Curated annotation (Swiss-Prot):
Pfam families: Tryp_alpha_amyl (PF00234). The lineage of its organism: Eukaryota, Viridiplantae, Streptophyta, Embryophyta, Tracheophyta. The 38 kDa precursor may be cleaved into two polypeptides of approximately the same size. The mature protein is composed of a single polypeptide containing one or more intra-molecular disulfide linkages. This is 2S seed storage protein. Residues 1-20 form the signal peptide. Residues 21-161 form a propeptide. Keywords: Disulfide bond, Seed storage protein, Signal, Storage protein. Residues 195-215 are annotated as: Disordered. PANTHER family: 2S SEED STORAGE PROTEIN 1-RELATED, 2S SULFUR-RICH SEED STORAGE PROTEIN 2-LIKE. Residues 195-208 have a biased composition (Polar residues). It comes from Helianthus annuus. Belongs to the 2S seed storage albumins family. One of its GO terms (molecular function) is nutrient reservoir activity. This is a 2S seed storage protein.
Amino acid sequence: MAKQIVLALAFAALVAFATAHTTIITTTIEDENPISGQRQVSQRIQGQRLNQCRMFLQQGQNIPREFDNPQMGRQQEQQLQQCCQELQNIEGQCQCEAVKQVFREAQQQVQQQQGRQLVPFRGSQQTQQLKQKAQILPNVCNLQSRRCEIGTITTTVTESNIDIPFRDRPFGTGSQQCRETEIQRPVGECQRFVEQQMQQSPRSTRPYQQRPGQQQQQQRGLQQQCCNELQNVKRECHCEAIQEVARRVMRQPQQQQQQRRGQFGGQEMETARRVIQNLPNQCDLEVQQCTTCTG
């Protein structure tokens, strides 16, 4: 999965400003060859059941080649046969429009499911895969029209960044929804994971207390728990969650500040910066942009 991650963590400025980031993905499908009487055709296929076709389109990622694969899964092969039956039950002049309709429905449903499950949406790549699979249906299903052009697919990404004082901004205030639903989610495991990495920094002044095997096992456990915390946060709030981890690492209770300055030096802080910067990749998050301003 392609990731574009810009994560600038300037620890001295974490208490000053943060960036509220919003990404809006809009997919537009333009019909290049609209048929005459399209409204009548749409009305004719409106009541048709195309569930198997929609399920078939949503299955798998290696779209075009799997039609010729003799080892195609039995379930998917049955879905293809049932999809062909659904399309063949539609009037010949309406079959292409039915393919276009089921493609649009499958594309919309995939986006909705990914939003609910907090799975990063792959954008135009996955939409193109659905399109390729749908365009092969007329030939595979022996429809009256062997060629059915879905249309041009355009994916637009709109981003906005607004700098607001971090001290006035609790965890997750990149949007009203983040503020109301995500502020209660803890990030304590991520904080512990980062601090553990700081303690294991080559120049750390903390005493060595564990065997290497025990350290690695504990590190993997904390990293997994940290990733679980971040993945349980809504996608649009991932940036705020990571910034909250950094803020907590830097802003320990006042009574611990003196002790902390003796424990963590410049090398440890560089380790913390690197660990936090790698969190989106390690936890398979999709953070298009996450910037902490320096002034």
